[in-house]
Protein backbone atom coordinates (compact mmCIF):
# COMPACT_ATOMS: atom_id res chain seq x y z
CA UNK A 1 0.00 0.00 0.00
CA UNK A 2 2.83 2.40 0.92
CA UNK A 3 4.59 1.69 -2.37
CA UNK A 4 1.41 2.40 -4.35
CA UNK A 5 0.79 5.59 -2.36
CA UNK A 6 4.33 6.78 -3.11
CA UNK A 7 3.86 5.93 -6.79
CA UNK A 8 0.63 7.95 -6.96
CA UNK A 9 2.23 10.89 -5.15
CA UNK A 10 5.14 10.92 -7.59
CA UNK A 11 2.79 10.75 -10.58
CA UNK A 12 0.66 13.58 -9.19
CA UNK A 13 3.75 15.69 -8.62
CA UNK A 14 4.92 15.05 -12.18
CA UNK A 15 1.48 15.87 -13.59
CA UNK A 16 1.28 19.10 -11.61
CA UNK A 17 4.75 20.11 -12.82
CA UNK A 18 3.79 19.43 -16.44
CA UNK A 19 0.53 21.37 -16.09
CA UNK A 20 2.45 24.28 -14.56
CA UNK A 21 4.88 24.28 -17.50
CA UNK A 22 1.95 24.22 -19.92
CA UNK A 23 0.20 27.11 -18.15
CA UNK A 24 3.36 29.23 -18.14
CA UNK A 25 3.88 28.97 -21.89
CA UNK A 26 3.46 32.40 -23.49
CA UNK A 27 1.76 30.93 -26.57
CA UNK A 28 -0.21 27.71 -26.83
CA UNK A 29 -1.42 26.64 -30.25
CA UNK A 30 -0.38 25.94 -33.81
CA UNK A 31 1.38 28.90 -35.45
CA UNK A 32 -0.07 30.29 -38.65
CA UNK A 33 0.99 33.12 -40.97
CA UNK A 34 -1.55 35.55 -42.37
CA UNK A 35 -0.76 38.07 -45.08
CA UNK A 36 -2.28 41.50 -45.43
CA UNK A 37 -1.00 43.41 -48.40
CA UNK A 38 2.76 43.16 -48.31
CA UNK A 39 2.91 42.45 -44.56
CA UNK A 40 2.90 39.09 -42.76
CA UNK A 41 1.49 38.50 -39.28
CA UNK A 42 1.68 35.62 -36.85
CA UNK A 43 -1.26 33.99 -35.07
CA UNK A 44 -1.71 30.85 -32.98
CA UNK A 45 -4.62 28.58 -33.78
CA UNK A 46 -6.24 26.51 -31.04
CA UNK A 47 -9.51 24.67 -30.51
CA UNK A 48 -11.33 25.92 -27.39
CA UNK A 49 -14.66 24.42 -26.27
CA UNK A 50 -15.09 22.81 -29.68
CA UNK A 51 -14.47 26.03 -31.60
CA UNK A 52 -11.40 26.97 -33.61
CA UNK A 53 -9.83 30.19 -32.31
CA UNK A 54 -7.07 32.33 -33.78
CA UNK A 55 -5.09 34.67 -31.52
CA UNK A 56 -2.86 37.45 -32.83
CA UNK A 57 0.76 37.27 -31.68
CA UNK A 58 2.67 39.91 -33.65
CA UNK A 59 4.29 40.95 -36.89
CA UNK A 60 6.15 38.14 -38.59
CA UNK A 61 9.79 37.61 -37.76
CA UNK A 62 11.80 34.44 -38.24
CA UNK A 63 12.73 34.44 -34.56
CA UNK A 64 9.14 34.74 -33.34
CA UNK A 65 7.93 32.10 -35.79
CA UNK A 66 10.58 29.64 -34.58
CA UNK A 67 9.60 30.38 -30.97
CA UNK A 68 5.97 29.54 -31.77
CA UNK A 69 7.05 26.32 -33.47
CA UNK A 70 9.13 25.32 -30.43
CA UNK A 71 6.26 26.14 -28.08
CA UNK A 72 3.82 24.09 -30.16
CA UNK A 73 6.21 21.14 -30.25
CA UNK A 74 6.86 21.32 -26.50
CA UNK A 75 3.12 21.60 -25.75
CA UNK A 76 2.44 18.46 -27.79
CA UNK A 77 5.15 16.56 -25.92
CA UNK A 78 3.81 17.73 -22.55
CA UNK A 79 0.25 16.69 -23.42
CA UNK A 80 1.54 13.29 -24.54
CA UNK A 81 3.28 12.88 -21.17
CA UNK A 82 0.11 13.99 -19.36
CA UNK A 83 -1.96 11.35 -21.16
CA UNK A 84 0.58 8.71 -20.17
CA UNK A 85 0.49 9.83 -16.52
CA UNK A 86 -3.32 9.77 -16.50
CA UNK A 87 -3.23 6.14 -17.67
CA UNK A 88 -0.69 5.24 -14.98
CA UNK A 89 -2.81 6.93 -12.31
CA UNK A 90 -5.89 5.03 -13.45
CA UNK A 91 -3.95 1.74 -13.34
CA UNK A 92 -2.78 2.61 -9.82
CA UNK A 93 -6.39 3.07 -8.71
CA UNK A 94 -6.29 6.84 -8.27
CA UNK A 95 -9.62 8.68 -8.41
CA UNK A 96 -9.96 12.39 -9.18
CA UNK A 97 -12.64 12.86 -6.52
CA UNK A 98 -10.38 11.88 -3.62
CA UNK A 99 -10.21 15.46 -2.31
CA UNK A 100 -12.67 16.16 0.48
CA UNK A 101 -15.33 18.83 0.13
CA UNK A 102 -13.52 20.91 2.78
CA UNK A 103 -10.32 20.89 0.74
CA UNK A 104 -12.16 21.70 -2.50
CA UNK A 105 -13.94 24.61 -0.78
CA UNK A 106 -10.64 25.74 0.72
CA UNK A 107 -9.05 25.84 -2.74
CA UNK A 108 -11.91 28.01 -3.99
CA UNK A 109 -11.63 30.27 -0.92
CA UNK A 110 -7.87 30.70 -1.43
CA UNK A 111 -8.34 31.44 -5.13
CA UNK A 112 -10.89 34.14 -4.30
CA UNK A 113 -8.34 35.79 -1.98
CA UNK A 114 -5.22 35.15 -4.05
CA UNK A 115 -4.66 38.75 -5.18
CA UNK A 116 -4.73 40.03 -1.61
CA UNK A 117 -2.45 37.20 -0.47
CA UNK A 118 0.05 38.04 -3.22
CA UNK A 119 -0.12 41.71 -2.25
CA UNK A 120 0.48 40.94 1.45
CA UNK A 121 3.47 38.76 0.56
CA UNK A 122 4.84 41.44 -1.75
CA UNK A 123 4.67 43.94 1.12
CA UNK A 124 6.55 41.47 3.33
CA UNK A 125 9.28 41.37 0.65
CA UNK A 126 9.51 45.17 0.50
CA UNK A 127 7.90 45.44 -2.93
CA UNK A 128 6.68 49.04 -3.22
CA UNK A 129 3.41 48.55 -5.08
CA UNK A 130 -0.12 49.51 -4.08
CA UNK A 131 -2.86 46.89 -4.18
CA UNK A 132 -4.30 48.28 -7.46
CA UNK A 133 -0.81 48.12 -9.02
CA UNK A 134 -0.35 44.56 -7.77
CA UNK A 135 -3.74 43.62 -9.17
CA UNK A 136 -2.83 45.14 -12.54
CA UNK A 137 0.40 43.14 -12.67
CA UNK A 138 -1.41 39.91 -11.76
CA UNK A 139 -4.05 40.49 -14.44
CA UNK A 140 -1.90 41.89 -17.24
CA UNK A 141 1.70 40.95 -16.43
CA UNK A 142 3.03 44.50 -16.60
CA UNK A 143 2.48 48.08 -15.45
CA UNK A 144 4.31 51.37 -15.87
CA UNK A 145 6.14 52.95 -12.94
CA UNK A 146 7.14 49.66 -11.28
CA UNK A 147 10.61 48.13 -11.55
CA UNK A 148 11.05 44.97 -13.60
CA UNK A 149 12.35 43.21 -10.48
CA UNK A 150 9.20 43.97 -8.50
CA UNK A 151 6.97 42.93 -11.41
CA UNK A 152 8.86 39.63 -11.65
CA UNK A 153 8.49 38.98 -7.91
CA UNK A 154 4.74 39.58 -8.04
CA UNK A 155 4.29 37.38 -11.11
CA UNK A 156 6.34 34.64 -9.46
CA UNK A 157 4.15 34.82 -6.35
CA UNK A 158 1.08 34.54 -8.57
CA UNK A 159 2.53 31.49 -10.34
CA UNK A 160 3.51 29.86 -7.03
CA UNK A 161 0.00 30.32 -5.63
CA UNK A 162 -1.52 28.98 -8.85
CA UNK A 163 0.80 25.99 -8.57
CA UNK A 164 -0.20 25.00 -5.02
CA UNK A 165 -3.91 25.54 -5.75
CA UNK A 166 -3.81 22.94 -8.51
CA UNK A 167 -5.83 19.90 -7.41
CA UNK A 168 -2.99 17.49 -8.18
CA UNK A 169 -0.56 19.56 -6.16
CA UNK A 170 -2.94 19.82 -3.20
CA UNK A 171 -3.27 16.02 -3.32
CA UNK A 172 0.52 15.71 -3.03
CA UNK A 173 2.55 15.63 0.17
CA UNK A 174 3.95 18.73 1.83
CA UNK A 175 7.58 17.66 1.81
CA UNK A 176 11.02 18.96 0.90
CA UNK A 177 10.43 18.36 -2.80
CA UNK A 178 7.24 20.42 -2.73
CA UNK A 179 9.07 23.24 -0.91
CA UNK A 180 11.94 23.07 -3.41
CA UNK A 181 9.57 23.38 -6.37
CA UNK A 182 7.83 26.37 -4.77
CA UNK A 183 11.22 28.03 -4.20
CA UNK A 184 12.12 27.43 -7.83
CA UNK A 185 8.93 29.20 -8.94
CA UNK A 186 9.35 32.23 -6.64
CA UNK A 187 12.98 32.59 -7.77
CA UNK A 188 12.19 32.27 -11.50
CA UNK A 189 14.12 34.87 -13.48
CA UNK A 190 16.51 35.57 -10.61
CA UNK A 191 18.41 32.28 -10.18
CA UNK A 192 18.90 29.40 -12.59
CA UNK A 193 18.43 26.85 -9.79
CA UNK A 194 16.26 28.75 -7.34
CA UNK A 195 14.96 25.55 -5.74
CA UNK A 196 18.39 24.13 -5.00
CA UNK A 197 19.50 23.95 -1.37
CA UNK A 198 21.83 26.76 -0.34
CA UNK A 199 25.53 25.94 -0.53
CA UNK A 200 27.05 29.28 0.47
CA UNK A 201 26.92 31.33 3.71
CA UNK A 202 24.36 34.13 4.00
CA UNK A 203 23.65 36.91 6.47
CA UNK A 204 20.32 38.44 7.43
CA UNK A 205 19.96 42.21 7.42
CA UNK A 206 19.18 43.70 10.81
CA UNK A 207 20.08 40.52 12.69
CA UNK A 208 23.18 39.02 14.25
CA UNK A 209 21.89 35.54 13.39
CA UNK A 210 23.99 33.68 10.82
CA UNK A 211 22.15 30.59 9.59
CA UNK A 212 24.38 27.53 9.23
CA UNK A 213 24.62 25.79 5.89
CA UNK A 214 21.56 23.55 5.56
CA UNK A 215 21.93 19.81 5.09
CA UNK A 216 19.36 18.31 2.73
CA UNK A 217 18.83 15.14 4.78
CA UNK A 218 18.38 17.18 7.97
CA UNK A 219 15.87 19.51 6.29
CA UNK A 220 13.85 16.58 4.92
CA UNK A 221 13.82 14.94 8.35
CA UNK A 222 12.83 18.12 10.19
CA UNK A 223 9.94 18.82 7.82
CA UNK A 224 8.74 15.22 8.25
CA UNK A 225 9.12 15.50 12.03
CA UNK A 226 7.06 18.72 12.20
CA UNK A 227 4.28 17.22 10.08
CA UNK A 228 4.14 14.02 12.11
CA UNK A 229 3.77 15.85 15.43
CA UNK A 230 0.35 15.51 17.06
CA UNK A 231 -0.63 19.16 16.79
CA UNK A 232 -3.42 21.24 15.30
CA UNK A 233 -3.14 21.80 11.57
CA UNK A 234 -2.68 25.55 11.94
CA UNK A 235 0.14 25.13 14.48
CA UNK A 236 1.91 22.66 12.20
CA UNK A 237 1.63 25.10 9.28
CA UNK A 238 3.12 27.93 11.38
CA UNK A 239 5.99 25.70 12.54
CA UNK A 240 6.74 24.71 8.94
CA UNK A 241 6.70 28.35 7.86
CA UNK A 242 8.99 29.62 10.61
CA UNK A 243 11.41 26.68 10.45
CA UNK A 244 11.92 27.17 6.71
CA UNK A 245 12.39 30.93 7.15
CA UNK A 246 14.96 30.56 9.92
CA UNK A 247 16.90 27.78 8.20
CA UNK A 248 17.28 29.91 5.03
CA UNK A 249 17.21 26.75 2.96
CA UNK A 250 17.63 28.53 -0.37
CA UNK A 251 19.82 31.35 -1.59
CA UNK A 252 16.86 33.72 -1.81
CA UNK A 253 13.07 33.79 -1.63
CA UNK A 254 12.90 31.94 1.68
CA UNK A 255 10.06 33.97 3.22
CA UNK A 256 8.02 33.75 0.02
CA UNK A 257 8.57 30.01 -0.37
CA UNK A 258 7.98 29.34 3.34
CA UNK A 259 4.61 31.11 3.48
CA UNK A 260 3.36 29.39 0.33
CA UNK A 261 4.67 25.99 1.48
CA UNK A 262 2.85 26.38 4.81
CA UNK A 263 -0.29 27.27 2.90
CA UNK A 264 0.04 24.15 0.78
CA UNK A 265 -0.03 22.08 3.96
CA UNK A 266 -2.88 24.09 5.48
CA UNK A 267 -5.11 24.13 2.40
CA UNK A 268 -4.51 20.42 1.73
CA UNK A 269 -6.02 19.79 5.18
CA UNK A 270 -8.97 22.13 4.64
CA UNK A 271 -7.63 24.50 7.27
CA UNK A 272 -7.92 27.93 5.62
CA UNK A 273 -4.77 29.86 4.83
CA UNK A 274 -1.98 31.82 6.52
CA UNK A 275 -1.54 35.53 5.91
CA UNK A 276 0.70 38.27 7.27
CA UNK A 277 -1.41 41.38 6.61
CA UNK A 278 0.25 44.60 5.46
CA UNK A 279 -0.42 46.41 8.74
CA UNK A 280 1.29 43.64 10.74
CA UNK A 281 4.44 43.35 8.60
CA UNK A 282 6.65 45.74 10.67
CA UNK A 283 5.81 43.93 13.92
CA UNK A 284 6.20 40.54 12.26
CA UNK A 285 9.67 41.45 10.99
CA UNK A 286 10.69 42.70 14.45
CA UNK A 287 9.55 39.46 16.09
CA UNK A 288 11.09 37.39 13.31
CA UNK A 289 14.51 38.82 14.17
CA UNK A 290 13.92 37.89 17.83
CA UNK A 291 13.02 34.35 16.77
CA UNK A 292 16.12 34.14 14.56
CA UNK A 293 18.29 35.24 17.48
CA UNK A 294 17.06 32.56 19.88
CA UNK A 295 13.65 33.55 21.24
CA UNK A 296 11.08 30.77 21.55
CA UNK A 297 8.83 30.21 18.53
CA UNK A 298 5.83 31.44 20.53
CA UNK A 299 7.23 35.00 20.39
CA UNK A 300 6.24 35.16 16.74
CA UNK A 301 3.68 32.38 16.24
CA UNK A 302 1.05 34.43 18.05
CA UNK A 303 1.52 37.31 15.60
CA UNK A 304 0.77 35.26 12.48
CA UNK A 305 -2.73 36.05 11.31
CA UNK A 306 -4.85 33.10 10.25
CA UNK A 307 -7.92 33.12 8.05
CA UNK A 308 -10.16 30.12 8.50
CA UNK A 309 -12.25 28.77 5.65
CA UNK A 310 -15.49 28.83 7.63
CA UNK A 311 -14.77 32.24 9.16
CA UNK A 312 -13.86 34.74 6.41
CA UNK A 313 -12.68 37.25 9.03
CA UNK A 314 -9.06 37.17 10.16
CA UNK A 315 -8.37 35.53 13.50
CA UNK A 316 -5.27 35.64 15.65
CA UNK A 317 -3.67 32.30 16.38
Regions found by a protein language model. Give the residues of each.
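FIC/Doc superfamily catalytic core
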Residues: 1-41, 47-309
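Single conserved hydrophobic/aromatic residue that forms the stacking wall/gate
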Residues: 308-317
Amino acid sequence: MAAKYNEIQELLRSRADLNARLNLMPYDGTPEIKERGNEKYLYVRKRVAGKQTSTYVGAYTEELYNLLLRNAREAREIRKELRSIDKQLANAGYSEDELSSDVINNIAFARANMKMNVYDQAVLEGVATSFPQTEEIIDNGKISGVTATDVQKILNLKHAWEFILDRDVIASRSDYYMLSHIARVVNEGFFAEGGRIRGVPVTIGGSSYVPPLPNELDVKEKIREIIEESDEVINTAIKLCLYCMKTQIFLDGNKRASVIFANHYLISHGGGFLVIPEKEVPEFKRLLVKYYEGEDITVIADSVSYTHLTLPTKLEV
